[in-house]
Amino acid sequence: MSRKPIIAGNWKMNKTAAEAREFIDAVKNNIPSNNLVDTVIGSPALFLEGMKKGVKGTELQVAAQNCYWEDFGAFTGETSPAALAALGVDYVIIGHSERRDYFHETDQEINKKAHAIFKHKMTPILCCGESLETYEAGKTAEWIEGQITADLKGLSAEQVSSMVIAYEPIWAIGTGKSADANIADDICGVVRATVEKLYGKEVAQAVRIQYGGSVKPENVAEYMAKENVDGALVGGASLQADSFLALLDFVK
């Protein structure tokens, strides 16, 4: 099965509203056709409304970096999935290692977020990944299988087929280190095998799996050439318009 590539930038807690507008203006009319690749920017919640207005009429898509699992209520500081959907947000990143580590998010909470995102007809980008200790102990496959199984609990085959799963080795995020393309392909293969075990081969062949971890314009093509890697979730290299556009050169 041919899966359309997806390149998603994750700005994390960076940029002002003016800088976000400047980036969008530089990028939105210079990306490849979405017949070839889905191009997504994950923005801080503050800028999402402006981002959606800025990309209107173009093929650049917008992701939120997080949401809560309840639509509305007394949840100070949280972001409503219903409100994101009303803005027209396309994707929501959930389960990022920084959310799991710094904010102690659990697989059970991430699972509730996935259900909420699908309820509002957005697409989750579900992150999974292991620590250096787990990797060096040879327990990566076991760890990833446990995360994926818990995070997908109760989702339908149709939902899982349409979502994006991002493998991000924690030891490679923002460190300048990266899992080489063969390791990334192997672990993305573990993700796919776990989905197959849970949902069957057809779903496993449909779900798109990204690699995230110090992806740069210089190495993105090497990852994208691998059988189980369908895209990249990119942090630092997505912050500047020129480097973000260079990430998309692999489709040429």
UniProtKB/Swiss-Prot annotation:
One of its GO terms (biological process) is glyceraldehyde-3-phosphate biosynthetic process. InterPro entries: Aldolase_TIM, TIM_sf, TrioseP_Isoase_bac/euk, Triosephosphate_isomerase, Triosephosphate_isomerase_AS. One of its GO terms (cellular component) is cytosol. It is found in: Cytoplasm. Gene3D superfamilies: Aldolase class I. The keyword Transcription regulation does not apply. CDD domains: TIM. It comes from the Bacteria. Pfam families: TIM. Substrate binds at residues 10-12, 174, 214, 235-236. One of its GO terms (molecular function) is triose-phosphate isomerase activity. Pathway: Carbohydrate biosynthesis; gluconeogenesis; Carbohydrate degradation; glycolysis; D-glyceraldehyde 3-phosphate from glycerone phosphate: step 1/1. Its main location: cytoplasm. Keywords: Cytoplasm, Gluconeogenesis, Glycolysis, Isomerase. It is an enzyme of class 5 (isomerase). Its EC number is 5.3.1.1. Homodimer. Belongs to the triosephosphate isomerase family. Involved in the gluconeogenesis. Catalyzes stereospecifically the conversion of dihydroxyacetone phosphate (DHAP) to D-glyceraldehyde-3-phosphate (G3P). PANTHER family: TRIOSEPHOSPHATE ISOMERASE (PTHR21139:SF42). This is Triosephosphate isomerase. It comes from Streptococcus mutans serotype c (strain ATCC 700610 / UA159).
